């Protein structure tokens, strides 16, 4: 901000009478009409907290029922009226999540190698190409 010069003002006399101290309730409400601004963390703080949380835990990240519907939908293309044991669907989900976690780790390394912190589709493509999954 640009600095501005202060102009001299004529005083109107002696000291003004002292005001009474405000009550605690009046002091706590802000001067902007009593609407308190909600607390917000800085960008990236919550993301880092989530990363640490999910790295510590071992539970499945994808919800079970949507994954089961996806498995059944894909299986319909190969054979109709297929039945799945619940353990088979859980095994598929474990394998799928392990694969995705590994892929995202490699993708992140590709992004870091390109001096970026944001992963992009080209990072996933490069990671898969290096792995030999996609020519």
From Swiss-Prot:
The keyword Phosphoprotein appears for this protein: yes
Species this chain originates from: Chlamydomonas reinhardtii (Chlamydomonas smithii)
The protein's assembly and partners: The nucleosome is a histone octamer containing two molecules each of H2A, H2B, H3 and H4 assembled in one H3-H4 heterotetramer and two H2A-H2B heterodimers. The octamer wraps approximately 147 bp of DNA.
Record-given protein name: Histone H3 type 1
Modified residues (Phosphothreonine): 12
Modified residues (Phosphoserine): 11
Entry's family note: Belongs to the histone H3 family.
Region annotated Disordered, chain positions: 1-40
Record keywords: Acetylation, Chromosome, DNA-binding, Methylation, Nucleosome core, Nucleus, Phosphoprotein
Domain of life, source organism: Eukaryota
């Amino acid at each position: 901000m640009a600095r501005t010069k202060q102009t001299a003002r004529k005083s109107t006399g002696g000291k003004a009478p002292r005001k009474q101290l405000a009550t605690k309730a009046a002091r706590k409400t802000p001067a902007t009409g009593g609407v308190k601004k909600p607390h917000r963390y800085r960008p990236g703080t919550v993301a880092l907290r989530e990363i640490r949380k999910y790295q510590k835990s071992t539970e499945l990240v994808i919800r079970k029922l949507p994954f089961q519907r996806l498995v059944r939908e894909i299986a319909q293309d190969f054979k109709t009226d297929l039945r799945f044991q619940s353990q088979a669907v859980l095994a598929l989900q474990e394998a799928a999540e392990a694969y995705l976690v590994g892929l995202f780790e490699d993708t992140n390394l590709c992004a870091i190698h390109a001096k970026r912190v944001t992963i992009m589709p080209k990072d996933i493509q490069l990671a898969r190409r290096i792995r030999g999954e996609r020519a």
